[in-house]
């Protein structure tokens, strides 16, 4: 398969609302899972993963019929009325900066998806008058307004040059250095900081802006007497910039920050609407998760592969990170199922299977032939049959609804994934240490990004025959997104995986190939991360709503990876923060 590669510079090494009370997480007894051996000769490893934290009984309890049906109907009616009023507000004639603030608030509150066409039309009008707008006093002399304009246009796929910041050179002719910005407000520096994370390859102005604003905000946190609300905003931004954040998690934070008046929005209707919408969408998530839990329990694969991670709820949380809007329910359904199989198959290749078994399994998946399973050991027969039936069922639904045969594309992505897993298994069993380039060329596929992207492509609501015929290779943005998932994963999991016995990760490849310390290797991996983000930022423009959806999913794959692997492995060890965020996004409504 031919692939569109990144520029060489970035591979330098060559439910129902029943109560306003917060739902409590389930308390389950921790059990160490051990696996039955397939044969006395086979040496089986075990990672001793944490067991599932979310029982099916608990998940089903989230959607028990509620006595508050009348109240829910009233809330739905109120939601629709507020939506109509906000649509009118968007269409009102406003000054450009006021329009930008409104769009920014809608996006950060997580409700912009209701007004996509209106927002796109507003930004298109602004973009068509960009030269005139940027010369006005408020943008010429206002760093905050200019940074907001820049970020929103880039974020929504419009072209805008970093030259918009030319007016903000300091007296020495440098950008954002010396004392040139000491009179700019802290809020403006925060806006510029967020804008700088939309930089493309070679944009030195934005790189300097990132350095300067990061230092400024760090100093702000240390200053006594500074505005506490602004300090909280700065701390949130320094932890992760907006462009790197999982959208739904940020939306909840932003709504609650507005409730605490840490953030100020111009129109109180927006906050009221956002709270109602968040809770309404959360009810949808509960119902989707409940149906998926019934499917997973009935499938019974967990009992047959007790050595593997059982992570249905966390797998669903991934999909909310990738496509949170209610309209993408079919993608969330198919991809949650896919995530469960990715996890199980990954553990077979990484931990449990012998090399001979793995070669057989890869061959059977590549053939996609149910008649070939007789050559597999029993545990693999169950796994392949479950995968085969589930993927074919997803393909059948698309065929029934759209008359399109997506099964060849789905099975190709699973074959690619298993082949990449097999390469890593051979490296491990043969004690081979790959170069960093060899490693990255294989593992951007083994992180499962292409399989996720393929599911998004095939489950898209507006998929056409022509779109399907064009899907002959993975686009560049899918590669960059997958690479980010791989690198984030490596930073979080490599130490534990090497200790239990696994192939060298990107960090160890750098250390071995270049003779550097682990600390230096980690910094080199972080630079790869920044480089791939720059590439993705340069590929956000879309020619159609279909392409726009796919590129958004690609970006959100990276954002969700950042969440799950930021400051540790929150997927393998699914208690702690992961449990907190499951409760926040999927279970507890906003009060």
Swiss-Prot record:
Task: Please provide the Gene Ontology terms (biological process) for this protein.
Answer: diterpenoid biosynthetic process; green leaf volatile biosynthetic process; monoterpenoid biosynthetic process; sesquiterpene biosynthetic process
Query: Which catalysed reactions does the entry list for this protein?
Result: (2E)-geranyl diphosphate + H2O = (R)-linalool + diphosphate; (2E)-geranyl diphosphate + H2O = (S)-linalool + diphosphate; (2E,6E)-farnesyl diphosphate = (S)-beta-bisabolene + diphosphate; (2E,6E)-farnesyl diphosphate = (E,R)-alpha-bisabolene + diphosphate
Please state the Enzyme Commission number of this protein.
4.2.3.81, 4.2.3.-, 4.2.3.55, 4.2.3.47
The transit peptide segment here is 1-46
Question: What residues does Mg(2+) 1 bind to?
Answer: 346, 350
Instruction: Provide the free-text tissue specificity comment from this protein's UniProt record.
Output: Highly expressed in flowers, petals and sepals, but almost undetectable in vegetative organs.
Assigned keywords, A-Z: Chloroplast, Lyase, Magnesium, Metal-binding, Plastid, Transit peptide
Positions with a binding annotation for Mg(2+) 3: 497
Q: Which CDD domains match?
A: Terpene_cyclase_plant_C1 (cd00684)
- Identify the residues that bind Mg(2+) 2: 346, 350
Q: Write down how the cofactor binds this protein.
A: Binds 3 Mg(2+) or Mn(2+) ions per subunit.
- pH-activity note: Optimum pH is 7.5. Active at pH between 6.0 and 9.0.
A cellular component annotation (GO) from this entry:
chloroplast
**InterPro entries under this entry?**
Isoprenoid_synthase_dom_sf, Terpene_cyclase-like_1_C, Terpene_cyclase_plant_C1, Terpene_synth_N, Terpene_synth_N_sf, Terpene_synthase-like, Terpene_synthase_metal-bd, Terpenoid_cyclase/PrenylTrfase
Look at the named UniProt entry and state the broad enzyme category this protein falls under: lyase
Entry keyword annotation includes rRNA-binding: no
Query: Which positions does the motif DDXXD motif occupy?
Result: 346-350
Q: In which pathway does it act?
A: Secondary metabolite biosynthesis; terpenoid biosynthesis
Q: Which cofactor does it need?
A: Mg(2+); Mn(2+)
Instruction: Cite the domain annotation text.
Output: The Asp-Asp-Xaa-Xaa-Asp/Glu (DDXXD/E) motif is important for the catalytic activity, presumably through binding to Mg(2+).
Task: Return the PANTHER family for the record.
Answer: OS04G0344100 PROTEIN-RELATED, TERPENE SYNTHASE 12-RELATED
The family annotation for this protein states: Belongs to the terpene synthase family. Tpsa subfamily.
State the protein's name.
Monoterpene synthase 8, chloroplastic
Query: What is the source species?
Result: Hedychium coronarium
Which gene specifies this protein's sequence? TPS8
């Amino acid at each position: 398969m031919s692939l569109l590669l990144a520029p060489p510079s970035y591979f330098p090494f060559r439910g129902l609302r029943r109560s306003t009370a917060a739902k409590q997480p389930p308390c389950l007894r921790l059990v160490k899972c051990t696996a039955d051996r397939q044969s006395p000769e086979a040496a089986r490893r075990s990672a001793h993963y944490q067991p599932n934290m979310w029982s099916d009984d608990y998940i089903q309890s989230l959607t028990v019929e509620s006595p508050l049906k009348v109240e829910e109907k009233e809330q739905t009616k109120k939601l629709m009325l507020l939506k109509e009023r906000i649509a009118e507000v968007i269409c009102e004639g406003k000054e450009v900066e006021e329009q930008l603030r409104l769009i920014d608030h809608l996006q950060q509150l997580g409700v912009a998806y209701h007004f996509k066409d209106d927002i796109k039309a507003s930004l298109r009008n602004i973009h068509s008058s960009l030269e005139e707008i940027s010369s006005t006093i408020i943008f010429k002399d206002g760093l905050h307004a200019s940074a907001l304009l820049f970020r929103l246009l880039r974020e929504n796929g419009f072209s805008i040059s970093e030259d918009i910041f030319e007016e903000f050179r300091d007296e020495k002719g440098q950008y954002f250095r010396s004392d040139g910005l000491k009179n700019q407000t802290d809020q403006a520096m925060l806006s510029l900081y967020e804008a700088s994370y939309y930089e493309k390859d070679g944009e030195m102005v934005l790189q300097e802006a990132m350095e300067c604003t990061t230092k400024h905000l760090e100093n702000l946190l240390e200053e006594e007497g500074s505005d506490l609300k602004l300090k909280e905003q700065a701390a949130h931004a320094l932890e992760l910039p907006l462009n790197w954040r999982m959208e739904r998690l940020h939306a909840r934070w932003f709504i609650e920050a507005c409730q605490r008046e840490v953030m100020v929005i111009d129109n109180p209707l927006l906050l009221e609407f956002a709270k109602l919408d968040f809770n309404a969408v959360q009810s949808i998530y509960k119902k989707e998760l409940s149906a998926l839990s019934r499917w997973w329990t009935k499938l019974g694969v967990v009992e047959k592969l007790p050595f593997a991670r059982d992570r249905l709820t966390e797998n669903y949380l991934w999909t909310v990170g990738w496509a949170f809007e209610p309209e993408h329910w079919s993608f969330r359904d198919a991809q949650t199922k896919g995530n469960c199989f990715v996890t199980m198959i990954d553990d077979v290749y990484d931990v449990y299977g012998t090399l001979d078994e793995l070669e057989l399994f890869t061959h059977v998946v590549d053939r996609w032939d149910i008649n070939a399973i007789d050559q597999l050991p029993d545990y693999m027969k169950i796994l392949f049959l479950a995968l085969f039936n589930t993927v074919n069922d997803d393909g059948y639904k698309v065929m029934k609804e759209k008359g399109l045969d997506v099964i060849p594309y789905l099975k190709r992505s699973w074959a690619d994934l298993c082949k990449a897993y097999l390469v890593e298994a051979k490296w491990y069993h043969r004690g081979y240490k790959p170069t960093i380039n060899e490693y990255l060329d294989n593992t951007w596929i083994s992180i499962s990004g292409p399989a996720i992207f393929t599911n998004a492509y095939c489950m898209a609501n507006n998929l056409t025959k022509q779109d399907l015929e064009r899907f002959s290779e993975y686009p560049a943005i899918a590669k960059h997104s997958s690479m980010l998932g791989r690198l984030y994963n490596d930073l979080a999991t490599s130490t534990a995986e090497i200790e239990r016995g696994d192939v060298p990760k990107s960090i160890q490849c750098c250390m071995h190939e270049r003779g550097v310390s682990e600390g230096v290797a980690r910094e080199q991996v972080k630079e790869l991360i920044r480089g791939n983000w720059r590439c993705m930022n340069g590929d956000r423009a879309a020619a159609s709503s279909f392409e726009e959806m796919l590129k958004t999913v690609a970006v959100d794959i990276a954002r969700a990876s950042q969440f799950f692997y930021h400051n540790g492995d929150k997927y393998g060890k699914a208690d702690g923060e992961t449990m907190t965020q499951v409760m926040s996004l999927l279970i507890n409504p906003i009060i």
